[in-house]
Amino acid sequence: MDALELCNKINMEAESLADSGFPLEVFPQKMQSIIIDMVVHGNFKVDYVAMSMLSAASAALGNTYRIHVKQDWDTNAALYIILVGRPGMGKTPPLQLAYKPIREYERKLFDKFCYELDLYEAACATKESGSKEMKKPILKRVTLDDFTLEALVLEHYNNLRGIAINYDEILGLLANTDRYGKNPMLERLLSIWSGCHLENTRVKNDRPQRVEEPCVNIIGTTQTKRMKELMASKFMDTGFLDRILVVYPKSKKVPHWLDEEDSHVRQSEASRKWADIIGKIFGLDYARCNDTNECCPNILYMDKDAHSLFFGWWNRNVDAINAIEDDEDVETRVMKHNTHVARIALLLQALRYACGESHLQSIDVDSIEGALRLNEYCENCYQRCRAFVAEDTCDSMSKELLYLLEDSFDTKTALKTGMENLHVTDRTVMNYIKELMKSGLITKAKKGFYEKVKFETGQATET
């Protein structure tokens, strides 16, 4: 154990960060130190800081590196992330801080564009020799916060490395998903996540745009009371919610401000170190194809141990899915976990490289292990959100029946309990069971048998 690792462990214990349940130790030691300083001196939640940084790292890496999953399947590291919490928990500030180096990078791109535009306009005005061959400069952007579908395609076409969508209130983005007629935003966001190409071939365009391998990150915030809107059937049934990593801290307490003279100095130093890491990731470039010399993404393969761990984990999921008899009982969200884990592993490998703590020749077992833990954390967050949404949406009589039943029960027991305790008919009890299943509070184990859905914090039905 080196000095930095020891220091991080001491600081984590001193600040009780282990109690948060967030697996901070999966990140590089240098990054852990930065996150701890931001949490302590910026009064932020460790969950929000770390996952915002993961999103920013993905935006910087873009399409330059991809991870090989199996056969012809490889993927970039694009993530859809939502930071959930009550008002005043400080969701937006750490997101802005994590993306500050990205904004600075964009400012440099803007300054370069303005300089080149001045040269172009001057050449055109004086009609210098060769000015007709001079291409008009194009402004490259990395982040978007308000856009149309056409604008998204155009901006990504101008910056094939990748685009990051930042929305302070994520439902503001999703509210636009119904206004595009035959080509809705929601369907595009689904296909983008899956790696399907983007194109804009409207007649009014001087030149059609096509992005063969889109890399679009999405990160935003929302309040806990609005999760009910996000878990509506429109987003659940389409599979959009399956593609989202949910970040929801266990503790709802707002951190106290610390009256320390050097807090701003410590936070500024942490921000500078983070900017250095993002700068190194931005410095990574495409590979060159041997036959055409065109830019091609670098493909990283898992080493033997990483491959064994990843495939073993996924095959256990497959075994559990294959054991389910009723198609309606299959949890569609699980089917996206392999993509989430692969993408997070690629990011952790790149971050460890940028921190000088590993290589970037392959994906090692540490990155896979870290990705599995982060995916599990985000899934627990999602399940806890689903628990309180289910409590709100399920009617009181259905919940009362559930409180009276054991963790596992059969139809006969439910009917008897309903008749003896609630004085309702068999048909009414079956309607209650349908309501409980619809709300996600119970699942069908097999025909005639049901189980209560348990969440990380206990049963979804706890009071």
Name the predicted role of every residue range.
Residues 1-463:
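Phosphate-handling catalytic cores of nucleic-acid transaction enzymes
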